[in-house]
């Protein structure tokens, strides 16, 4: 496994993500330097907190443009939590905020009318809609842990 650039946008669970990656044999470099992101061969974008604050942290460090340029060169990237949400065009948490726009769609709050408690916290089953390398070793229906009040609504579900 090549070096993975772990982006530090000023918020996030960096240490736990770094340890998880190292546990599977990855060499990890934590950085908030756009130049390191631009030269990356793999990127992980973790995040915790509010969408708008997270995007402000990316922009203040010049990481938003660096991520977009890296992805345009087809550098593999994984977004975790708010890092995944940031890949979309708009996040609606505490007002509308512009995301990175790498994926078409919006990050929206779960409806209060749902019969589940929001935030959704706990173990639940995954439903894998499409085959993807990321889910290659994960069975449809596998249990994973969730802690969120918002979800990504892509414009195209494929």
What does each model-found stretch correspond to?
Residues 1-5:
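Extreme N-terminal starter segment of soluble prokaryotic enzymes
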Residues 11, 47-49:
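Short glycine-/small-residue-rich Rossmann-like dinucleotide-binding loops
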Residues 27, 42, 76-78, 143:
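Structural signature of beta-strand start/N-cap positions in the alpha/beta core
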Residues 28-39:
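Short acidic low-complexity segments
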Residues 37-47:
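Short acidic/histidine-rich motifs immediately flanking catalytic phosphotransfer sites
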Residues 49-121:
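Cysteine-nucleophile active-site neighborhood
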Residues 90-158:
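Pocket-forming structural segment of enzyme catalytic cores
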